[in-house]
């Protein structure tokens, strides 16, 4: 489980997002590409 908070150019308020697996996260991240302005991992997701 990967949990992050991210912001984009059009979404300056941090948004929490959960991913089942690191592969799912990597796919999402490459899909978002340059839209992402910040990504912070959140530890200890349950």
Swiss-Prot record:
This is Putative gene 54 protein.
